UniProtKB/Swiss-Prot annotation:
This is Adenylosuccinate synthetase. Mg(2+) binds at residues 14, 41. Binds 1 Mg(2+) ion per subunit. It is an enzyme of class 6 (ligase). It holds the Pfam family Adenylsucc_synt. It is found in: Cytoplasm. The keyword Zinc does not apply. It catalyses: IMP + L-aspartate + GTP = N(6)-(1,2-dicarboxyethyl)-AMP + GDP + phosphate + 2 H(+). IMP binds at residues 14-17, 39-42, 130, 144, 225, 240, 304. Plays an important role in the de novo pathway of purine nucleotide biosynthesis. Catalyzes the first committed step in the biosynthesis of AMP from IMP. GTP binds at residues 13-19, 41-43, 306, 332-334, 414-416. It comes from Pseudomonas putida (strain ATCC 47054 / DSM 6125 / CFBP 8728 / NCIMB 11950 / KT2440).
């Protein structure tokens, strides 16, 4: 009997999901992406060699693992082909193992132009998108006017829909944002060129997942971004345009929730955020700078510096509830090495002095102060440690306290960037 295991982020993204997916796919027959697009940036380090994936599932570096892109993912053909080419240049076979749902929405040049024009127009009030067209592509999907991967293989139908879409979007670009129009013929020609390359990789991903399930194969579901960026449950409006929480798995892959056996919540040992939006535990002092430097906290997709702060048990409790988390993977524990004291946020105090839980929108965070519990740090190095017993006592106490505060077990601890620098206490596929 196979198991279906989910790996998703519990914070604002950048928790280290790529490494853990790569580690666990040793036991998986297939890995599927079910939401987001090439705004994701999953960094894998294998034998010291770094690989960053944006759209292709992280299982691609494991020989024989099938990689699937589900209907909930927005696909930019140009970005996908660049990523495939880079991997092939490294000797990684991709086209034989990558399959893409025909129902996945396309990101095209006008989505990128709109995304960037809107952020520019917002000025200081910008959301902090990656500018890669993710939001506008999801808008077209929900408005039922979007083009999908399967449309690429019907030229006349595709051209007719594309013409209508460009009439609609170019009007905004030219008249409202004062940006140049997107050319119809150039866009059509580019898309038809990509169609020839993508056609052999197209597959009914939902049907394939159920075939694998019925055959008793282990399947990994790879989330992108983090729970606090969910369009419904995140710090709205400073969120992404997809459901990053567990509910997005079923809608984005076609595999119902009753078939999911274990949900692993990837959680950084401190907290980071890229772009705008509330961040109660953010540090503006030397400690924050130290975390950023040691943790190499720069976005793998945008290159933007990440904001850093103390561990926030409040948002993790919310993520555990929303996702029905089975177990936690605590990453980047080694970044905390050498700190004399470490703070954990255990609640938020509002203007009336009452301690409250996580709000459901960005405005409700205004005026909140984090309530901290101070713990002793440790001077010993935890980098590369592979057993719980080898960790300093203070590090073990920190892990135990997090478990107590959030009500979920820490099943995996990451002590470095390489797939081998990991402590596995309970294996999700066991």
């Amino acid at each position: 009997m196979g198991k279906n295991v989910v790996v998703l982020g519990t914070q604002w993204g950048d928790e280290g999901k790529g490494k853990i997916v790569d580690l666990l796919t040793e036991h998986a027959a297939a890995v599927v992406r079910y939401q987001g697009g090439h705004n994701a940036g999953h960094t894998l380090v294998i034998n010291g060699e770094k690989t960053v994936l944006h759209l292709i599932p992280s299982g691609i570096l494991r020989e024989g693992v099938q990689c699937l892109i589900g209907n909930g993912v927005v696909v930019a053909p140009d970005a996908l082909m660049r990523e495939i080419t880079k991997l092939e240049e490294k000797g990684v076979p991709v086209r034989e193992r990558l399959r893409i749902s025909p129902a996945a929405p396309l990101i095209l040049s006008y989505h990128v132009a709109l995304d960037q024009a809107r952020e520019k127009a917002r000025g200081e009030a910008k959301i902090g998108t990656t500018g890669r067209g993710i939001g506008p592509a999801y808008e077209d999907k929900v408005a039922r006017r979007g083009l999908r991967v399967g449309d690429l293989f019907h030229r006349e139908r595709f051209a007719a829909k594309l013409g209508e879409l460009l009439d609609y979007h170019n009007f905004q670009l030219v008249n409202y944002y004062k940006e140049p129009a997107i050319d119809f013929q150039q866009t059509l020609d580019e898309c038809m060129a990509y169609a020839e390359q993508l056609k052999p990789m197209m597959l009914d991903v939902t049907a394939e997942l159920h075939n694998l399930r019925r055959a008793g194969k282990d399947i990994m579901f790879e989330g992108a971004q983090g729970s606090l960026l969910d369009i419904d449950h995140g710090t709205y409006p400073y969120v992404t345009s997809s459901n990053t929480t567990a509910g997005g798995i079923s809608t984005g892959s076609g595999v119902g929730p009753m078939y999911l056996d274990y949900i692993l919540g990837i959680t950084k040992a401190y907290t980071t955020r890229v772009g705008s939006g509330p961040f109660p535990t953010e540090l503006f002092d030397e400690t924050g700078a130290t975390l950023a430097k040691r943790g190499h906290e720069f976005g793998s997709t945008t290159g933007r510096a990440r904001r850093c702060g103390w561990f926030d048990a409040v948002i993790l409790r919310r993520a555990i509830d929303v996702n029905s988390i089975s177990g936690i993977c605590l990453t980047k524990l080694d970044v905390l090495d050498g700190l004399e004291t470490i703070n954990i946020c255990v609640g938020y105090k509002n203007e009336n002095g009452a301690v409250i839980d996580a709000p459901s929108d960005a405005d409700s965070y205004i005026g909140l102060e984090p309530v901290y519990e101070e713990m002793p740090g440790w001077s010993e190095s935890t980098l590369g440690v592979k057993t719980l017993e080898e960790l300093p006592q203070a590090a073990r106490d920190y892990i135990k306290r997090i478990e107590e505060l959030v009500g979920a077990p820490i099943d995996i601890i990451s002590t470095g960037p390489d797939r081998n620098e990991t402590i596995v206490l309970r294996h999700p596929f066991a």
